[in-house]
């Protein structure tokens, strides 16, 4: 991008450059930075609303703290584009979230300024506390700062960390980036003054001295505490953070550098755990994003002068939409159904369900552990819970899945969105492990629909069971196989032969069925749509194995412990020896990029499957014909 419109930003190649700027120029820098973020994201796609809301806070943090010596830990991390731009990665922004380019989240391997990798929520306070106490152990006076959003504060892990931090006496600053409220201008001026006063050395010393003097006069001390709280209560709600041992400061306007910088400077000189409450607005500075921050949360490419527009040709139906429609249809049919999501209403396709069945919709916040056990409790009382959750986020509730659901054999349906590779969000959001970690749990079953129609059908099958079942499906559009309007399921635990060929049989789990069919056409191979990773259709498997010289399993999940491993176990248990090639995701974390390109790099497109099969089984009888196919 041309830097002609960003003369001040062009001079900032790292935070040291920023700290050399006159304070009077920082507002101009913030203005240019916001415009640069908007231009950049409009060309690449990515997270927008959250990044527009953290511009001034990012500028203030790098202006006040000695980064990277002082540690900044950004919770979730999708709001770190301004941070990346100010820390030497401005010129790489055109590569954002592309194969080989910048990550959309902080990555330690990408920059020394990314002190901790984040993407899942509510981890920042724990990480920053660990850094702060490690520094204290070494006698290092560095500051450690956790920046966490109000949504992430709903997770239990954040409060576990606060509880630990309050008694650890570490030089930790927790900044609550609250973008779910606003401060009116009249309150803002008074609030700015009180925030600076309460964050100052004088206030801290006076408060401690007063407590010392009054320690033998409990009634007076209690009165002083009440007066202190009432003084703060003029402009802030009652807060529990001081109960955790933090010095609470705020709320202050997170877009006002004249308030942010002096407050942070005062806090920098304080010892012990500090809690700063800043109020920001998602989409700040771009009217369209301010008006609809959800729509502009993670847009694709767009013209910022026009905003988001609907495509002229309707896109293919996504698996998420298939789930959302099924949920509404099944709710119409069965009044016992309830839908549960851990703060992913839009992402999981539950908007219509929420609108139509508000009394049966439960958004429990970013609290995956609670969501799973909450569903278990409902199932105990005869309710039929459906938990809509991203595959990667179910990892956070693994103990609850085993202990609270499976151990009690409760009929909970888990709709696992974003199974497999997710493209631009990268390794942190990939659903690579669900087959492996679900199929090893007693009582649990795992369905792997191949297309939109099967997704709806297998959701129905899962719902009809009297034990827990997970249904995994990928992000994005399907293959164009329209779902049937009825609510008929498919046979539980049964697959089907989709193509009959010679010598080699490809056992496909999930949406890789379709590239497998393409590869089989060239190889004249049999293709089996397995549908279920657990229970495995052992009868069909052994029949196919007996009729073929070699077997190939394909899955968009980890090879280790995955569906291919289940096939190998079944063959071994039956005492049947057949050459077996397992194709899937290798034992590495796969980074961000275009999903089709990522699959091709792992050999999971049709050409890659054909190549791997030919290379592996070239020594079998008829290999010449196979190699020439």
From Swiss-Prot:
Subunit structure: Homodimer.
Role played: Catalyzes the acyloin condensation reaction between C atoms 2 and 3 of pyruvate and glyceraldehyde 3-phosphate to yield 1-deoxy-D-xylulose-5-phosphate (DXP).
Cofactor binding remark: Binds 1 Mg(2+) ion per subunit.
UniProt xrefs under SUPFAM superfamilies: Thiamin diphosphate-binding fold (THDP-binding), TK C-terminal domain-like
Known EC number: 2.2.1.7
Gene (UniProt): dxs
Gene Ontology biological process terms in this record: 1-deoxy-D-xylulose 5-phosphate biosynthetic process; isopentenyl diphosphate biosynthetic process, methylerythritol 4-phosphate pathway; terpenoid biosynthetic process; thiamine biosynthetic process
GO molecular function per UniProt: 1-deoxy-D-xylulose-5-phosphate synthase activity; magnesium ion binding; thiamine pyrophosphate binding
Native species: Acidovorax sp. (strain JS42)
Reactions catalysed according to its record: D-glyceraldehyde 3-phosphate + pyruvate + H(+) = 1-deoxy-D-xylulose 5-phosphate + CO2
Pfam families: DXP_synthase_N, Transket_pyr, Transketolase_C
SMART domains: Transket_pyr
Enzyme class label: transferase
Official protein name in the record: 1-deoxy-D-xylulose-5-phosphate synthase
Residues reported to bind thiamine diphosphate: 78, 119-121, 151-152, 179, 286, 368
Cofactor needs: Mg(2+); thiamine diphosphate
This protein's UniProt keywords: Isoprene biosynthesis, Magnesium, Metal-binding, Thiamine biosynthesis, Thiamine pyrophosphate, Transferase
Family per similarity comment: Belongs to the transketolase family. DXPS subfamily.
Pathway(s) served: Metabolic intermediate biosynthesis; 1-deoxy-D-xylulose 5-phosphate biosynthesis; 1-deoxy-D-xylulose 5-phosphate from D-glyceraldehyde 3-phosphate and pyruvate: step 1/1
Gene Ontology cellular component list: cytosol
Residues reported in the UniProt entry to bind Mg(2+): 150, 179
């Amino acid at each position: 991008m041309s830097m002609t419109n960003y003369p001040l930003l062009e001079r900032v190649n790292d935070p040291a450059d920023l700290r050399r700027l006159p304070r009077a120029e920082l507002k101009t820098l913030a203005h240019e930075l916001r415009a640069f973020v908007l231009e950049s994201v409009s060309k690449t796609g990515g997270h927008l609303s959250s990044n527009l809301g953290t511009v001034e806070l990012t500028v203030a943090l790098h202006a006040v703290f000695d980064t990277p010596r002082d540690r900044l830990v950004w919770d979730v991390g999708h709001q770190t584009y301004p941070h990346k731009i100010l820390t030497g990665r401005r010129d790489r922004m055109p590569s954002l979230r592309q194969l080989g380019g910048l990550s959309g989240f902080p990555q330690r391997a990408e920059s020394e300024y990314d002190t901790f990798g984040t993407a899942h929520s509510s981890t920042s306070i724990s990480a920053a506390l660990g850094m702060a106490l490690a520094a204290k152990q070494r006698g290092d006076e560095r500051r450690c700062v956790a920046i966490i959003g109000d949504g992430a504060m709903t997770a239990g892990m954040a409060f576990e960390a606060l509880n630990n931090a309050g008694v650890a006496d570490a030089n930790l600053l927790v900044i609550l980036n609250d973008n779910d409220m606003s401060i009116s201008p009249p309150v803002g001026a008074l609030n700015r003054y009180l925030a600076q006063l309460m964050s100052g050395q004088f206030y801290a010393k006076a408060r401690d001295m007063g407590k010392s003097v009054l320690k033998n006069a409990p009634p007076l001390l209690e009165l002083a505490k009440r007066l202190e709280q009432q003084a703060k209560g003029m402009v802030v709600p009652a807060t529990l953070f001081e109960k955790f041992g933090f010095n609470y400061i705020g709320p202050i306007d997170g877009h006002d550098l004249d308030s942010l910088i002096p407050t942070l400077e005062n806090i920098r000189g304080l010892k012990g755990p500090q809690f700063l409450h800043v109020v920001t607005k998602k989409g700040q500075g771009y009217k369209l994003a301010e008006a609809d921050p959800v729509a502009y949360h993670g847009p694709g490419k767009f013209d910022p002068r026009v905003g988001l527009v609907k495509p002229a040709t309707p896109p293919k139906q996504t698996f998420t939409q298939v789930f959302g429609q099924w949920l509404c249809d099944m709710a119409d049919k069965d009044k016992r159904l309830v839908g549960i999501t851990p703060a992913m209403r839009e992402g999981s396709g539950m908007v219509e369900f929420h609108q139509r069945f508000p009394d049966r919709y439960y958004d429990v916040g970013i609290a995956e552990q609670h969501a799973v056990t909450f569903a278990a409790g409902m199932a105990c009382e005869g309710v039929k819970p459906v938990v809509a959750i991203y595959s990667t986020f179910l990892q956070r509730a693994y103990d609850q899945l085993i202990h609270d659901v499976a151990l009690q054999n409760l009929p909970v349906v888990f709709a696992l969105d974003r199974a497999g590779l997710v493209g631009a969000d990268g390794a942190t959001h990939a659903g690579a492990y669900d087959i492996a970690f679900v199929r090893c749990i007693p009582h649990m079953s795992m369905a792997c629909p191949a297309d939109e129609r099967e997704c709806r059908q297998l959701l129905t099958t899962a719902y009809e069971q009297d034990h827990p079942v997970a249904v995994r499906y990928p992000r994005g559009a399907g293959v164009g196989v329209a779902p049937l309007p009825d609510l008929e399921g498919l046979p539980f635990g049964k697959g089907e032969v989709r193509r009959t060929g010679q010598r080699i049989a490809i056992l496909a789990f999930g949406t890789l069925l379709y590239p497998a069919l393409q590869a089989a056409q060239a190889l004249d191979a049999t293709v089996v749509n397995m549908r279920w990773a657990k229970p495995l259709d052992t009868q069909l498997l052994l029949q196919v194995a007996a009729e073929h010289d070699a077997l190939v399993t394909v899955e968009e999940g980890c090879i280790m412990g995955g569906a291919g491993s289940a096939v190998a176990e079944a063959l071994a248990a039956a005492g049947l020896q057949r050459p077996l090639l397992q194709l899937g995701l290798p034992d590495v974390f796969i980074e961000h990029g275009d999903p089709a390109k990522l699959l091709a790099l792992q050999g999971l497109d049709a050409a890659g499957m054909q190549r791997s099969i030919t290379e592996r089984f070239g020594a079998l009888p008829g290999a010449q014909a196979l190699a020439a196919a």
